[in-house]
Amino acid sequence: MSSTEIPSYVSNDGRVGGTRSGEVPVLDGGNIIILSGLLIGFVYGSVGLLSGFCLLSSLRGWWADGDGRLIRTYALAIGVAVAATQLLAAGGLVDIGKSIYLQSSFSMPVMFFGGLLFGYGMVLSNGCGSRALVLLGRGNLRSFVVVVVLAIFAQMTLKGLIAPTRIAMVGASQSTATANSVPALLAGAGLSATAARMLAASVISAALIIFAFVHPAFRRSPGQVAAGLVVGLLVAGGWFATGYLGADDFNPVPVTSLTFIAPIADALQYVMLSTGSTLNFGIVTVFGVFAGSLVTALLTGRFQLEGYRSPRHMLRSGGGAALMGAGGVMAFGCSVGQGLTGFSTLALASMIAFAGILFGTAAGLRGALRVGPLATA
């Protein structure tokens, strides 16, 4: 039997056995995760193209243009992700405590600093990693440079030349928290674990959803409402796929959801060294986002090849991608990985990293380090 065959089947009488002609194959946990990642990424890519879902565009529209619809879309996505993820955890379907976001030991300064770098780099490149994948699918060749440079600097920070510096910074500032999440803080105040989880999730998700829907223009934008709902559910879908559908005691996989720093770096490595690499949820999500955007762009007539206007434009965009790659690794995620997926766990570390991203973005859009927009979105 070849390595690509699925080694089991379900017969008409319910028996399970070896692969046979005419029988229905049974997907194992690994294959379920791969297919789920492709589907989730595809939908995210399509929604991202149609709605313009992007933290940078949201903040720029809110702060500079007075248009608060996109930031409400992002807030709704976070609120839905928090509610759905915490319901999965409360129901015992997914153990989010196994994720990288809920570690008891982390470096607050490094995560915040990484967020600052990522946020400022996002302004320089005029979009985050996930947005670059969406734009690449639409034919934006500038985004190809962003994706490749981001991947290279992420690998350099994870395992390469920058890694020793990162490790030294973490080692000098790492601390162990008695509570690593908002529910844990409430539980420390005397609430039961379940009550603490439900209270924290209810208050935070309700506040975000109310913030979204009190805006009249947002309520009159069904496309933006749908985008926020779908993206929030995609985050929960990723948790469900890796933490429940793909759970396997004999072949455990990381419990995770949408994020676009290490996965973009891993995807580039897989493209170059596929015989020595293994597909995982993050890699196929990256491929799925590109495919979803490409198919949607072709079907809707949005596909158009675009390039850089000047060498300076390319240098600035590539520099921003480098900051995003290095900063995203230090922050353990990006505007999606920490701003949506990490935030959905209510982890304190994710909130610190996301705060850094917001401050870095503000510095680029409004602060002393302000830079003008580029035509890359």
Residue ranges and their predicted role:
Residues M1-S3, S11-N12, G17-G18:
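A cross-taxon signal for low-complexity, glycine/charged-rich
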Residues T4-I6, G18-A377:
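Membrane-interfacial helix-loop segments of redox and metal-homeostasis proteins
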